[in-house]
Amino acid sequence: MEEMQLVHQFRRMPPLTPAYVGRLKHELRIIEKHNLEPMFLRVREILDLMPDVPHNIRGSAGSSLVCYCLGITDIDPVEWDIPSTRFMHDLRPDAPDIDIDVPYNRRAEVFDRIFRKYGSRVARVSNRVHRDGEFHHWSLHCGGIIVTDDAIPSHMLLKPGQLNMNKDDVEKAGFYKIDLLSSRALAQLNDITDRPLFDYPRQDALTAQVLSSGNSIGIIGGESPAFRKAATSIGVTCMQDAALATSLIRPAAAENKKSEEPLVYEDDVIALIARTCRVESDMADLIRRQIVKGKGMEVIGPDGEPILKDPALRQRVESFRAYAFCRSHGVAYGAVVWALAYHKARNPADFWKSTLAHAHSMYRPWVHPHEAAPHLSTHPRQGELFPLDIREEWKKFGYWSSPQMVPGAELFELEDGSDRWRFCGPIAASRVWYSKKDNRKLTFLTLGVGPQTYINITVPFGLPAGGWTAAEGVAKRGKNGEYTASLVRECYLGGPSRKKKR
């Protein structure tokens, strides 16, 4: 294994302790056995084309010590205690993926460098688009490329630089697909600093306060009501907690979090199968893949029966057909959220300048400018000769430049001993959710009720709130600080006029 070319490309040498040496030997043996060395070398070669472009490795590749030693990822899987099974093992029938995130505003530049270096040896992967069950046309895959040793034959191309193959075709043909994906969060962070992503302190009181208090609006990947609720519920204290919060809100983890043994990551499912069925982790992952992908295939044991027989366990594994993170993916995303929270706490002006430049938020257009206003002395309309009233500004531009909340926004407890609260405010975000289990609709509202102050309200029925600018009503406050409305209606506090339906 010391003769493998891969080892000579290491950018980091791991500590010579049993944990690192044993892990490295294990991974190198699998790589050599399955002829995966060219894929790792190609990814390292591509990263060498972009030394000035920040990147982050999403997905399971962050669980590989070889990837860490090559400088492909900055996640040390031994330090973070992440097994490599989710990424690669002896029983995995296909090649693992290495997905690279780069700032969205620099990805075209990265593609240009790659195509200039490899020329006719590189091409983008395509998607098959079907209509009414029939193939209709090709589209471009979001970021997949292949790089070959020789020129790609013309019969494999739709046009120069684009394959007439989708990701499954690429895999069947024996090519390694590498994904280059866009990240607004990396662009946001890169505009603030060039500090390496994993160079931040793992524990920091000011950073933790931003996240645990729910003050994370503006942090791409960490501002949704669901994330803010998760972060405040667990009380984020460190980078690892930030990773947990980003993962808890994914559908599969959300469904399993109330179980006696919560399952958050796909790695947790592998460990549960291995322990319950008394099999090695690679067999456990094979079982997980067969069930989660829903192909109706069973992994059969020596007795001719399915290895996973427990119906309750099977149901829990099947729940991970919904979207979930592997642990290294959660760490990669959590690290970005943690770094952005660090700068929001310490450099709010730089943070908000970058946020206003790069964020495409789920919140209404007024929310980010309102949050940024206290920290920016040169807000776009501050200092105008004839400054507008907040309501007039909101109506004309869709947002206002004052750090104050729209007049009329309020939240106060009713004096009848019922623990009911009167609320009124502009809608920051709204979402209607349909519960198949209960066959009913819920509406989730986030309202501004004071300067940089928001509440989350659950309405136990569907609302056409997407067209509302503001709402008022009465709600009961739960122990978790969330509100459930018993009465809600549209009100008008200013802002853009509703468009009349034709």
State each model region's role.
Residues 1-502:
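Noncatalytic, beta-rich nucleic-acid-contacting surfaces in large DNA/RNA-processing enzymes
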